[in-house]
Amino acid sequence: ATHLNQGGALLVIYMDGSVSCNHGGTEMGQGLNNKMAQVCADGLGIGVDKVRITATDSQKVPNASATSASSGADINGAAIMNATAQMRERLKPVAARMLGCSEADITFANSEAHGGGKSVKWEEVTKQAWLDRVGLSVTGFYMTPEIKYDFIKLNGRAFYYYCYGAAVSEVEIN
């Protein structure tokens, strides 16, 4: 079912530079939340210690797809990447003003904004963004490409990838 091939994320940045991220996946011991925290941190150019993944909540990220195999990491991680890309674009003008350079020169890495041969701490950028009344929350979305299924003709590709498994039992009868 193609409708199960989508993911969402809610990203909120606080003026102190801390980040709250909610996604539609379900953590059940596979390390999904740790993976999503790392994706979020990498996308913003900050340390994972600044990111808090909050419990899955359909009031924050509605209509989530099922979490199965690695699809939870792929689909929700891509939604988080979409959200962090939006936020970087939103913060670039703030950082550019602070650094006296072009928005095109701004990059985020090592918990700093860099541009024009200078840098400013992430926390200073987020505080200035808050003072400038820049929205510090975004929603991210992702849908897997190249899928289409015709339920009448029963053909097509309903999922981007499939889960496979195998079980083996060795039995000794006495």
Region roles according to the model:
Residues D49-A55:
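Generic long, charged, amphipathic alpha-helical segments
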Residues A1-S20, G24-L44, T56-N174:
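Cofactor-centric catalytic regions
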